[in-house]
Amino acid sequence: MYKNYVFDMYGTLVDIRTNEWKSYLWDKMTEMMGFYGAVYDRKELKKKYDLYSAQLEQEMKQSEPHPEIDLAKVYERLFAEKGVEVSPQTIAFFMNMFRVVSTKFIRLYDGVTDLLEELKNRGKKVYLLSNAQSNFTRPELRYLGLEPYFDGILISSEEGCKKPGKTFYQTLLQRYQLDPKESIMIGNDSVSDIQGAYEMGMDSLYIHTEISPECVEDLKSTYTIMDGDFTKIKSMILA
């Protein structure tokens, strides 16, 4: 039916709940950064974090209409402002800590492993196209056992662009020499995943889950699952 199956991650394969605003998170980040010599109070740290994130995004918009910043660069600036030099490994540690403390739970949806195994058994190519932070997502892929299933993984923070922008989709198609007519995008975002794929000439499957953004009225998906039941996907796209 299709040769290439392209998946979104969060809200599609992975059910996750995070809270990046809770005081406890920023208290602990403030303490840990202080241990490394970058002394902030909580409000100052959050304010600077938001400021540097916005500045980086604005800088990138000069060359890319759908930019994705790498939050590692935000941490670099936060440490540099206090005169502290840190390694990429230390920044990765801080981002891992931020993610773990802010995450309520993370788990696979029912049926994910079954579908991915079936795709591989049939000789299909499987790809990940995710709007995400590499220092969050790559450890989570390993933790959830998903990494071995993918023939290619594209994460927006590594590429500097994100869905629904054409640049991110074009990077996937060109890097792995994929024919859009032989490919399908599976995701839970009616704009980033479905509209983006439609504009690239790809078929798509929209699955509406609890963490999906509001669905657009003019949904361009080839297939649609509105009740969030991932187990329905196999029969729809592997006939």
Where are these regions (language model features)?
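N-terminal helical cap/lid subdomain that shapes the substrate entry/recognition surface
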Residues: Y2-D110
